[in-house]
């Protein structure tokens, strides 16, 4: 695993897997309470993506990355870290894939990387203010209460409900990071991530799990030039439920 120093933090490092390959590197950004080091090895090793250089990023506060206390953990803050990765590695061109919260982060990063961005792919991203069911549930708590006990309770509840993989990622995520990211998703952005996605002048694709259909957020996107692709036999957690199907959807989006 490799790391970069994040500017403006107290020597905090963001860690990532750099899987060797050819062509334009694909930067992979995970969702809330997740980690790319956990969710995406099976996707990255699928035959349709092998041979492509891929950077599997663990955002600050998640996975193997550091957990600075004096960091905002907003979508914009995380996007700045993704940009820092691209700049520090001196990558002349990149593709971005982000899932859920990572989709919103990828959209924000895309706005800052337009000179280097080749293609943008998002999987069931947060596009409008208000967050999702999970982020709203977390953000409804006071920060101190969530950090003290709420995070542990949510993690244990998920484990008991059969969400073992996600619960494991949550267990190693910083409670403060998860809470602040959730409140950022609820707050949204202005312009909205949806408007930013529709306005970008690069090839864009949005991936939806079949079990998430009907999916209202796709309305109007094809007319704006955003391709919509479906992953069969999967819902929101598509990287876990059908990694091969997600790999194929990403590969097709980058073709």
Where on the chain are the PLM-derived regions?
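Flexible "cap/lid" loop of the alpha/beta hydrolase fold
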Residues: 107-112, 117-148
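Conserved serine/cysteine hydrolase catalytic core
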Residues: 176-230, 239
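Active-site loop/oxyanion-hole signature of alpha/beta-hydrolase fold enzymes
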Residues: 44, 55-97, 248
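Conserved alpha/beta-hydrolase catalytic His-Asp/Glu region
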Residues: 131-137, 144-199
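Gly/Ala-rich beta-loop-alpha elbow adjacent to hydrolase catalytic centers
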Residues: 98, 102, 106
